[in-house]
């Protein structure tokens, strides 16, 4: 009888060990996924920053262009 109980206990312990091993593997996979997603997020943020800088340069260029056009229009008004 006690041998039977010991075998049942051994089976439960083995099942627990197997479950722990599987959970450890899952944790490692999740860590790898998290690292990859973190890297993707950093790249996306860097790309966003570059796009924002490019947009600001375009706005600055447009403002300069508009100022030059206003200056030229002002000179044309003076000529007329």
Curated annotation (Swiss-Prot):
Q: Where in the cell is it found?
A: Cytoplasm
- Superkingdom of origin organism: Bacteria
Q: Where is this region: Disordered?
A: 41-60
Which Gene3D superfamilies did the record assign? 1.20.5.340
| Cellular compartments per GO CC | cytoplasm
Return the Pfam families for the record: ZapB
Keywords linked to the UniProt accession: Cell cycle, Cell division, Coiled coil, Cytoplasm, Septation
- Supply the name of the protein: Cell division protein ZapB
């Amino acid at each position: 009888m006690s041998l039977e109980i010991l075998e049942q206990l051994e089976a439960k312990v083995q099942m627990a060990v197997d479950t722990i091993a599987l959970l450890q593997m899952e944790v490692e996979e999740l860590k790898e996924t998290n690292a990859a997603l973190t890297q993707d997020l950093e790249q996306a943020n860097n790309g966003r920053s570059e796009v924002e800088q490019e947009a600001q340069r375009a706005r600055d260029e447009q403002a300069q262009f508009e100022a030059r056009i206003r200056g030229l229009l002002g000179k044309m008004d003076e000529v007329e």
